[in-house]
Amino acid sequence: MQFIEIVEKLKKGQSGVVDFKIKNNPVILTAASLENAKDNDISFLDNNSPLNLRNLIETSKASALLLPANDTYIIEIAKKISVDWIILKEPKIAFAETLEFLYPSNVESEGIHKSAVIGQNVKIGLGVSIGANAYIGDNTEIGAGTIIHAGVVLYRNVRIGSKNLIHANSVIHSGSKLGDKCVINANAVIGGEGFGFVPTSNGWKKMPQVGIVILKNKVEVGSGSTIDRPSVGETIIGEDTKIDNLVQIGHGVTTGKGCAMAAQVGIAGGAQIGDGVILAGQVGISNRVKIGDGVIASSKTGIVSNIEAGTVVSGFPAIPNKLWLRCSANFKKLPEIAKAIRQLDRKKSR
């Protein structure tokens, strides 16, 4: 792809092209970091990049650069170098869009592989691809343009919207509903049984889990993640929510739109998550907790009670992040503080 083609495509995107220079109009074949780029590569510098990366634009071997509009230092250097460039309001978004141009998703050929098993009364939309050894249960519906890779299992009565991408060996249980443009990565399980057992004098009594899971439009679920169905009712994942690998979402959880959850997050049953909530790696949330819109929880935070909207929390149990930082700074001083207190006690007892 020639550089001018990338320029024209980015003009139509979301990155905000401010200016560009086309001198050599190189053919761009791949993308790379500034330090590793070579001929026919395109690279980028993000807003607020550290000085050591900013200085690399003078020595990088990339054939083209995506540069931030808010950095006057970079813009001055760009005017002096011979490399073609684009100046943008959001260079990271531009780089993401450029990767999409250069590395289009591998699209399976339309149609149903001969080894796939298709149940009764299954409705399959136009342009659907179903890979080898996939299993589609009775009364399931699959929307137009959806791609189902090898080994996927859709139980009966599943509803899949249009343009979804379901990767190999994922399992979607009975009654689950996916909106449009969802991505389910390999080995994820949607709608598995919630963890429901009742203690009795004779041991544990299993609580049947007959509810369903609903994923709204543009939800992405990482490899090995699980979203459980409840005993009754629904587990709901809001539109445009992004879930990393190895995340566990319990029965009856609801999330708002635009949430993000990093690896090994665990959310217990019945928790209610607002819009735009960000959960860093290994965050744990107790059952039935309510978390307001825009909450951010740093890594390993343990949330055991409700959190107000817009709060940034850390630690276990979760406390405001600034307080946690102060506590953490003092933690290593505790031996000295304890020693001082003992000395005061001895003086007092004399």
Curated annotation (Swiss-Prot):
InterPro entries reported for this sequence: Hexapep, Hexapep_transf_CS, LpxD, Trimer_LpxA-like_sf, UDP_GlcNAc_AcTrfase_non-rep
Known partners and oligomeric status: Homotrimer.
Classification of source organism: Bacteria, Bacillati, Cyanobacteriota, Cyanophyceae, Synechococcales
Pfam families on file: Hexapep, LpxD
A GO term for molecular function: structural constituent of carboxysome shell
PROSITE patterns: HEXAPEP_TRANSFERASES
Active site (record annotation): 251 (proton acceptor)
Function comment: Catalyzes the N-acylation of UDP-3-O-acylglucosamine using 3-hydroxyacyl-ACP as the acyl donor. Is involved in the biosynthesis of lipid A, a phosphorylated glycolipid that anchors the lipopolysaccharide to the outer membrane of the cell.
Record protein name field: UDP-3-O-acylglucosamine N-acyltransferase
Keywords: Acyltransferase, Lipid A biosynthesis, Lipid biosynthesis, Lipid metabolism, Repeat, Transferase
GO biological process terms on file: lipid A biosynthetic process
Organism superkingdom: Bacteria
Pathway annotation: Bacterial outer membrane biogenesis; LPS lipid A biosynthesis
Reaction(s) this enzyme catalyzes, per UniProt: a UDP-3-O-[(3R)-3-hydroxyacyl]-alpha-D-glucosamine + a (3R)-hydroxyacyl-[ACP] = a UDP-2-N,3-O-bis[(3R)-3-hydroxyacyl]-alpha-D-glucosamine + holo-[ACP] + H(+)
